[in-house]
Amino acid sequence: MKIGILNTDTLKTEFDTKYGQYPAMFSKVLLHAEPKIEIYSYEVQTGEYPVELNECDAYLITGSKVSAYDDLPWIIELKNFIRTLHQHQKKLVGICFGHQLIAEALGGKVERAKEGWNVGIHAATLKKNTILFGSAEQEFNLIYNHQDQVTKIPQESKLLASSRTCPVAMLAIENHILSFQGHIEFDVAYAKDLLQMRRSILGEDKYLKACKTLDAIPQDLKVIDWILNFIKKD
């Protein structure tokens, strides 16, 4: 299986030194789950894309500090690539910004969350008709770190999970697109460092509450297993 990481951000040097860039984070967790995966990385911020769609079996769009509705040339180009992947029914996974950008590209809407930053570990609940992922009402924990959220889903998409703090936590389109607002690639140490970096922005109350949620166990391995099974499924 070949997975192409469409990288949409560059982390600060201090974070890069401790944790690596996003492609390294995703490679670490994906290879832990499935050591035989081949992983390729494309720096779409600078216009690097696969020469052919079939270079990889699936593509994954990372998180980013920018917004899905920003009018940046590379974001517009990536939205067009998403539409091309969708047209060819190529497997595509979106995480955080990737989740939002897929929704924006295919007719949905992304806006600032009225409640502000959603940070820490939170549980999302699966909806009905999610047999591939688990039974209805089953919960799964992921690390969240976002201030934008999907407020309108694409017409052809299916809402698969919601949480109290994130109404659109998981989406799918037919059998080839799957996306999550939460992070599978973050570990708790990185999440803590992000919270510390944004402490003054979050405010002390939200910061402390978010830190307390990090005592819970994120179920990223379960979600990674869902993603890999989704990619393998015809």
Outline where the language-model segments fall.
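Short, flexible loop segments at the rims of nucleotide/cofactor-binding pockets, characterized by
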Residues: 36-40, 69-71, 119-123, 139, ...
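Short glycine-/acidic-enriched loop or helix-start segments at secondary-structure transitions
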Residues: 15-16, 51, 70-71, 103-105, ...
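Short, glycine/charged-enriched secondary-structure capping and boundary segments
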Residues: 18-21, 54-56, 73-76, 107-110, ...
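Flexible, glycine-rich phosphate/dinucleotide-binding loops
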Residues: 12, 48, 68, 101, ...
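A structure-centric signal for secondary-structure junctions around beta-strands
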Residues: 56, 118-121, 137-139, 174
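Cysteine-nucleophile active-site neighborhood
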Residues: 62-130
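Amide-donor transfer/coupling interface in amidating biosynthetic enzymes
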Residues: 2-8, 27-29, 41-43, 87, ...
